[in-house]
Amino acid sequence: MFYFTKYANQKFDILNKHKVYFRREQIEEAIKLPDEVKKKNKNYFAKKDGVGVVYRKGGEATKIITFYPVK
């Protein structure tokens, strides 16, 4: 199960204002099937298809902290 933080939910609108569009499914897929994953402390950094995602695993839920476009 994926949980988007308040900031992560706001990030969709922030990026839309800059004409950068992501769907929730893209963010979730970057975590499920990433091209690259790194870990620093408790946070994981996943990249896939032009999106980077910062998230944290906890029990059954994965908390999505933020996401951003990558080249």
Predicted regions and their residues:
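Ribonuclease/tRNase effector modules and their secretory precursors
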Residues: 1-71
